[in-house]
Amino acid sequence: MNLKTLTMVALATSVVIAAVAQEKAKETLKVELPKPCFTGTPKDIKTENLEAPMGDKERDPIQVPAGTKVISKGCKVTSSDSEPIIGELGFVTDGDKDHDATTYVELGPNTQWVQIDLGKEKQISAACVWHFHGEARVYRDVVCQISNDPDFIDGVQTVFNNDHDDSSKLGKGKDKEYIETNKGRPFAISNVKGRYVRFTSRGNTSNEMNHYTEIEIYGKDL
């Protein structure tokens, strides 16, 4: 075996070792869930882009880099609706995920967003959103975007989008709509860096308002 071949083998081996080490450095994301709180009779929800109901089934586990933690608790929240109908914007990151009249913020109708300022650019690996889990309902046009621009004009990365018909004008999404439960909607975010995280929605199957109980962003300092 000549020197060139040995060098190529050594490089290939180092790549494999690095990949294995990186994989071992990952862990399963653990999301602390609030108690279930469905009230009343479940409605027959009809929507063309709905995922199969989860029931007692668990979502596939999300793998994140070791040391990943909640980086959004207590962070400043702004919104397209500066005067919420119910609640306060601070509820979105206060850590209280339980459902009652004092834990969620209600925004006006049509397309609205809430935006979390992480304070500085962070490495973001996952997120979980709880809109309103007091009953089974589906929120429309749920979109999550990340940017270092607070106005979301430059460098915007869309990491979740179930607006299948582009009715909120943020592009057509491939994710499915889902029924709200106490488990929220967690999703992985692959190697994205940013300071601001914006969640958008456009009403729900019960009424035209937009609600947020809690949003958790998971990541690490750079």
Model-derived features: where do they sit?
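Predominantly extracellular/luminal regions of secreted and cell-surface proteins
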Residues: 60-96
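Surface-exposed, low-complexity/disordered Ser/Thr/Gly/Pro/Asn-rich loops and linkers
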Residues: 100-106
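Hydrophobic h-region of N-terminal signal peptides that target proteins for export
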Residues: 12-19
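N-terminal pre-domain segments of enzymes
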Residues: 22-69
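Bacterial N-terminal signal peptides that target proteins for export
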Residues: 1-7
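Trp- and acidic/polar-enriched beta-sheet ligand-binding modules for extracellular glycan
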Residues: 22-41, 80-82, 106-113, 122, ...
